[in-house]
Amino acid sequence: MATYGQPCARPMCIPPSYADLGKAARDIFNKGFGFGLVKLDVKTKSCSGVEFSTSGSSNTDTGKVTGTLETKYKWCEYGLTFTEKWNTDNTLGTEIAIEDQICQGLKLTFDTTFSPNTGKKSGKIKSSYKRECINLGCDVDFDFAGPAIHGSAVFGYEGWLAGYQMTFDSAKSKLTRNNFAVGYRTGDFQLHTNVNDGTEFGGSIYQKVCEDLDTSVNLAWTSGTNCTRFGIAAKYQLDPTASISAKVNNSSLIGVGYTQTLRPGVKLTLSALVDGKSINAGGHKLGLALELEA
């Protein structure tokens, strides 16, 4: 489940959103790795408070280069956030969010995208409401065939969490997504289980073994198949500026990552993916990422 602060002294606190259930375990598997990519991320902030984020990556297998540019401005007095996005597919995006103004805990977001090359447009209205013991979300994705409604709810009490997520496609007049999740968390241990559409079953465990070592286990199984997916991952903080990550799954894919803070605002990540079943056959992947922030 998600890391969202230490447990409350009171029996009630704000649970994470449905998308963030199990996030602590997923982060151990995903962060610190970038197989098959050479990536550069740059973040900076102007004197007027405008935040700029640029990202570029090159796929070492295909040679394809992709990039994104994002600008964000927060008008704190009115709880407004304006975001502009662009990517190398020439898709433009605009997002306007207002939070804690209509009522405490309510956030409304208006999100639009436009592709000049194809003329394709999309729009989405997103809302979330979080208070003690509850976190609700409802998004409406507009489409010419008919809007799709995405809803989610998470309830929490004394460390226990229960969540539900659905998608209703008005064009087909039926539910296209129907997910359930149950979990439990304490300060250094988190357990999460989920059922997606009644066919996919999954679970994850996050454990902070000590101050410098985090571990994670995940398991997934799809009904109607004999395929079970299993993985173990760990992250160890070597010192305040360096960490090493490792993971392995039941397909004998072994991933290793090393992250080093070269100086404040400059972070380098090196990673490698090795196929344990065919070590001498090649096909292994390397990754390099550099993050700059000022």
UniProtKB/Swiss-Prot annotation:
Binding site for ATP: 23, 31
Family: Belongs to the eukaryotic mitochondrial porin family.
GO molecular function annotations of the record: ATP binding; ceramide binding; cholesterol binding; oxysterol binding; phosphatidylcholine binding; porin activity; voltage-gated monoatomic anion channel activity; voltage-gated monoatomic ion channel activity
Cross-link (Glycyl lysine isopeptide (Lys-Gly) (interchain with G-Cter in ubiquitin)): 31, 64, 120-121, 172, 277
Main location: mitochondrion
Gene: VDAC2
Keyword field contains Nucleotide-binding: yes
Gene3D superfamilies attached to this UniProt entry: Porin
GO biological process: lipid transport; mitochondrial outer membrane permeabilization; monoatomic anion transport
Location of N6-acetyllysine modifications: 31, 120, 277
Pfam families: Porin_3
Modification sites for N6-succinyllysine: 31
UniProt keywords, alphabetically: Acetylation, ATP-binding, Ion transport, Isopeptide bond, Lipid transport, Lipid-binding, Membrane, Mitochondrion, Mitochondrion outer membrane, NAD, Nucleotide-binding, Phosphoprotein, Porin, Transmembrane, Transmembrane beta strand, Transport, Ubl conjugation
Provenance organism: Oryctolagus cuniculus
Localisation per UniProt entry: Mitochondrion outer membrane; Membrane
Binding site for NAD(+): 253-255, 271-275
TM region(s), chain numbering: 37-46, 50-58, 65-75, 80-87, 91-100, 106-115, 122-131, 134-141, 148-156, 161-169, 174-186, 189-196, 200-209, 213-222, 229-238, 242-249, 253-262, 265-274, 284-293
Annotated positions of the N-acetylalanine modification: 2
Enzymatic reactions: chloride(in) = chloride(out); K(+)(in) = K(+)(out); a 1,2-diacyl-sn-glycero-3-phospho-L-serine(in) = a 1,2-diacyl-sn-glycero-3-phospho-L-serine(out); a 1,2-diacyl-sn-glycero-3-phosphocholine(in) = a 1,2-diacyl-sn-glycero-3-phosphocholine(out)
Protein purpose: Non-selective voltage-gated ion channel that mediates the transport of anions and cations through the mitochondrion outer membrane and plasma membrane. The channel adopts an open conformation at zero mV and a closed conformation at both positive and negative potentials. There are two populations of channels; the main that functions in a lower open-state conductance with lower ion selectivity, that switch, in a voltage-dependent manner, from the open to a low-conducting 'closed' state and the other that has a normal ion selectivity in the typical high conductance, 'open' state. Catalyzes the scrambling of phospholipids across the outer mitochondrial membrane; the mechanism is unrelated to channel activity and is capable of translocating both anionic and zwitterionic phospholipids.
Subunit details: Monomer, homodimer and higher order oligomers; formation of higher order structures is necessary for scramblase activity. Interacts with ARMC12 in a TBC1D21-dependent manner. Interacts with KLC3. Interacts with SPATA33. Interacts with PPP3CC in a SPATA33-dependent manner.
Residues that bear Phosphotyrosine: 78
Protein name: Non-selective voltage-gated ion channel VDAC2
Residues with Phosphoserine modification: 251
Involved in ceramide and phosphatidylcholine binding (site feature) positions: 85
PTM annotation, UniProt: Ubiquitinated by PRKN during mitophagy, leading to its degradation and enhancement of mitophagy. Deubiquitinated by USP30.
Phosphothreonine modified-residue sites: 118
